[in-house]
Amino acid sequence: MIENLELIRAQSATRAAGCDFMLLSSLHNVTYVSGFEVPVPVGAGAETAYGPSLVLCATHDAHNASWLIVSAANATAAKAQSRLAETLVFGTFDSFNPLDSRAQFLEQLLAIFKAAGLRNATVSLGIESRTTPHAVLELLTREFPYIRVINIDDALAQARSIKTPREIALLRRAAHIGDIGQRTLAELVQQAGRTEFEMWAELTSRMYAAVGHEIPVSGELVTGPRTCVVNYPAGPRVRTTQPGDAALMDISQRVDGYWSDCTNTHVIGGVEPTAHQKKFAHASQAAFDAALETLRPGKLASEVWQAANAAYEKHGIQMPHYMGHQIGAVVNELPRLVPYDHTPIQAGMVFAVEPGAYEGEGGTFGARSEKNILITESGPEVLSDFEWGI
């Protein structure tokens, strides 16, 4: 079995939290430890499956005591991708015979708990407080009264904080796919007259083609006056672009379980940006540069925010929102670049740095400048390779 550094880190963190076993239920943590890219839960496959994909794992044994539990709809992909010892499947739906998905899910889970030796033992089980199904907690209470349940949300977040070499490679690829989207937008904005929908369709299509299949994509593509405020969800819409309009795209995409998050701002139609537009775009870029210079091992997340804020002040613009966040199997994870987060920056972290500058309600322009940054021992490395639009 290939060494699974992500699983080892999760085991170490949850073992330190006092756990003998961990039961993972969130999309990102199951993906993180198993290597199976758990699908975003939409569509018939998600609706017919009673429970989510789960991982049960002993905190002391990486090879013989790890199970991935998935629905029948996900079985083929899970068995191909999983790096855990066993992959077990529960039924969801049958077109010709009744099938109780709830019973299938809980029976499979009960069998795995027994195989792990939980029935006759006093053990501590770490769970995720936000995503563990109530039916699973009922099963634990009824069948395993001696189990002590521990919340491991913080332990898992800490385990994921420093990226492994495998994760860094995946984040590089995700950033490359983000570059394709941003470069396509830079091409499309050279001519006015397209709708936001048309541009979004073209650039996401090119991203899909580069990956080889459809991928989860979220974010916004806004043009004209809608760029002057931050108002999620904000696009795309049917609006037809005009020469001189701003175009701002903040796009996130998940590739092989890992995210990119990048933003750029343009002026549409080959029109030279006005001095007013340059003021906001250059303030955003100056804040990005200040944050980038400060993102070094030993600095604090709050110090990155302070450096960016000083850049805003030099441009006479008030900081409108946070400066960014870590990124990985979660699109927006800790630490975040805010004045109250004093987490030390460490090599192996990957950030999405995203300062913006907006004219505000009633205005016509706003800009945001976001790229993905790997922290190395010698300083920051910019993973995103597209050029600023202004």
Task: Pin down the residues of each PLM region.
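Active-site neighborhoods and metal-handling regions in enzymes and metal-associated proteins
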Residues: M1-I390
